[in-house]
Amino acid sequence: LDAQPHPLSVYQGLTMIIGFTGTPGSGKTYEAVKKILDNLMKGKVIYTNIDGMFDPECQEMIKSYCNLSDLALTIQLRQLEPDQIADFWMHIEPRCLVVLDEIHKWFSNRDWNDPKNKQFGYWASTHRHYGYEVVLITQNIERVDAAVRSLLEWNYVYRKVNFLGSAVQRYYLCYSYGGDDTNGRPLVTNKRRYKPAIFRCYKS
């Protein structure tokens, strides 16, 4: 179903900041968890605050899905606490993947003059060669501070497949945009299929 190359294939070790946007049930969190699982299987260290991924039942499913030992999962998958997200860059290591859910709660457009928003931009600009990859998840990218939005290389907008029939829940749509502007025609459009096993790795 993913006939066209994913834009993230251009990632060459520079810091990459991308957005996953969509209403509840659109597939955005599912896609983020899938990305986490794919990177766990590659041996990457990941920091996230996605709900449920650190519950014992979900941890067992993650170990089974990725074929990881208890020790490997503990080393690779690390939880970011709520009080760490506003300065998450102080709690991570180079070349890791960071996946932040509900990012508008910490970097809101209503707090446009908050120093932490400027600090995020400063960190991103001064650590470009450290190989971080950061995924910012939100229901509406407009709710995120403009300075933070401007850091996005790509924004992926997820939508439900709104057709009647039993196959509806098997698929979702992904629209790929360059930067934070989602007006106009997307650069890439994909219809993607859900894998039921991934839902058991977090609280959907």
Name each region found by the language model.
Residues 169-204:
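Conserved P-loop NTPase motor module
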Residues 18, 47, 99, 135, ...:
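Hydrophobic/aromatic beta-strand patches that form the interior of the parallel beta-sheet core
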Residues 44, 94-97, 130-136:
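Loop/turn-to-beta-strand initiation segments
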Residues 1-15:
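Short, Lys/Arg-enriched N-terminal segments with co-localized hydrophobic residues
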Residues 55-122:
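Conserved nucleotide-sensing/catalytic segment adjacent to the nucleotide-binding pocket
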Residues 16-37:
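Glycine-rich P-loop/Walker A and Walker A-like loops and their local beta1-loop-alpha1 context
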Residues 44-52:
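Short beta-strand-centered segment that lines the nucleotide-binding/catalytic pocket of NTP-utilizing
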